Amino acid sequence: MNGGIYTIIAEELRRLGGIDRIGVVTAPGETAIIYAGDKVLKKYFDGTKKKSVIFSVSAMGEVERQKELVEKLCGIGEAFADSEPVIQGVFQPTVKINSLPVPTMKNEHYYIYTSSVEINFYMKG
């Protein structure tokens, strides 16, 4: 795994989506993005690879504010869909939403909603 390029991609997605941090959510009202997996889709004779990287985007909030959490994550998804990421070392990046926000954790005070984002791109070597 090339942690450097994945960190750069996560930072660009964080910037484009207005996400608070890279990692996990730790406080109400916070959003976060974290690496969730990758795969090589195709290899070419010149050493170029078409890759797919998946990130999980999460938001945490009070139980009575679930609608706001979903709207926040949908807004981040729209920002990704309307953007053109600029990432050094990759070309022709495209971003798509793999899953809409769903509740992934709940206790008596808070919910965490998560959606999945996939970025496909070409990379030399």
Identify the residue ranges that each predicted region occupies.
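Charged, amphipathic alpha-helical segments and their flanking helix caps
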Residues: M1-G23, D38-G125
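A short, hydrophobic beta-strand-centered structural micro-motif
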Residues: P28-D38
